[in-house]
From Swiss-Prot:
InterPro entries: Ribosomal_bS16, Ribosomal_bS16_dom_sf
GO terms (BP aspect): translation
Gene Ontology CC, one term: cytoplasm
Similarity comment: family membership: Belongs to the bacterial ribosomal protein bS16 family.
Annotated protein name in UniProt: Small ribosomal subunit protein bS16
Molecular-function GO term, any one: structural constituent of ribosome
Record PANTHER family: 30S RIBOSOMAL PROTEIN S16, SMALL RIBOSOMAL SUBUNIT PROTEIN BS16M
Length: 83
């Protein structure tokens, strides 16, 4: 099954996540089909906290990709910010 989930990056004590489309059997930070955005939970100042390619996210959801709980909330937040 194809899922949209977060892949962790960044360094110790400073997380940074990529929103990735991947097979659910792949490792969290492993192989992916496409990166559709990023999430920076510790963004400060002028840094961007969330960026999502809405067009690609809509495409993958239309193809049957299942978002994780956190990604579903982030997609909702991104849609609200763009509206």
């Amino acid at each position: 099954m194809v899922t949209i989930r977060l892949a962790r990056g960044g360094s110790k004590k400073r997380p940074f996540y990529h929103l990735t489309v991947t097979n659910s059997r792949n490792a969290r930070d492993g192989r992916f089909v496409e990166r559709i955005g990023f999430f920076n939970p510790v963004a400060t100042g002028g840094e961007v906290r969330l960026s999502v390619d809405q067009e690609r996210a809509t495409y993958w959801l239309g193809q049957g990709a299942q978002p994780s709980e956190r990604v579903a909330q982030l997609l909702k937040d991104a849609a609200k910010a763009n509206a």
